[in-house]
Amino acid sequence: MVTIIKPYFCEHSTDSFRGLVDVWGERGYCKVKPCPVPTYSFNTDVLNLPEAKCWMGDVGDIMLYDFALLDRIPADRNWKFSLWANSMLEGERSSAWSFWPKHSKLYEDFKINSRFSYDDREVLLGFVGSKTTPLRTLNWEQCCDFFILTASGDAYSPIGYLEVLSKMKFGLCLPGVGPKCLRDIEYMGLGVVPVITPGCSVEHFNRIEEGVHYLKANTPEEATELVGACSREKWKMMSDNCIEWFEKNSSIKGTFDTTMEILEKNNIGI
């Protein structure tokens, strides 16, 4: 059984990927060990230390880089192999990875009864989120029949937020802190067809395809045109494809299996 070393002194230690690691451990997919808290000087940015990353094996083995940007890479770049969830550092010892919901355990329970039919979804195109980047502008409100952009992101409880998403046929994707946003994956797992906009990334180890899993719009006007022209039959096909991709790549079991698949295909021993 593989071991994953997880730091507990950083943000998001109980949600996103680091919360997902705990669920992997609970299910017996891997052993989870706390990363030792490093000794550092007063002016050190601890998030740049190797001990602030998740690792498979030991520190320095397989880095599981779950930060949004490339500003938290260990200075010595001393790893045997690396997986990149959001922004990606290209190189021989690296691979694109996957992405996941913010609260995987809660999401796993919620999705069971929340994958609605076309007619049971009241919102044609929607978005709900916070203004984490200047790229998230109100310009996009004009193409949505449900649009909430808050300063703090606390408009809904985690369950309330997922309930809102589940009532959308199409979900607008705007860049987050990095080029990917957890919301995009949360759309897919609920059968909401993503509408990708400039600045968003769709790069994953197992790729998603335009016209198969998502639509792509460069402007609000184009988004309106695309969702308006999409037949319910095509929407159903894309919605089903999104759910299938999510289960294989972003569910609790799917993320672990994809992680191991990447390592196997790159001949990386654990």
Residue ranges with predicted function:
Residues 162, 200, 220-223, 242:
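Catalytic phosphate/metal-binding cores of nucleic-acid and nucleotide-processing enzymes, i.e., regions
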Residues 1-212, 216, 248-267:
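Nucleotide-sugar donor-binding catalytic core of glycosyltransferases
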Residues 222-226, 241, 254-262:
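Alpha-helical elements of Rossmann-like donor-binding domains used by nucleotide-donor carbohydrate transfer enzymes
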Residues 225-248:
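Conserved donor-nucleotide binding/catalytic region of nucleotide-linked donor-dependent transferases
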Residues 207-233:
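Histidine- and aromatic-rich ligand-binding microenvironments
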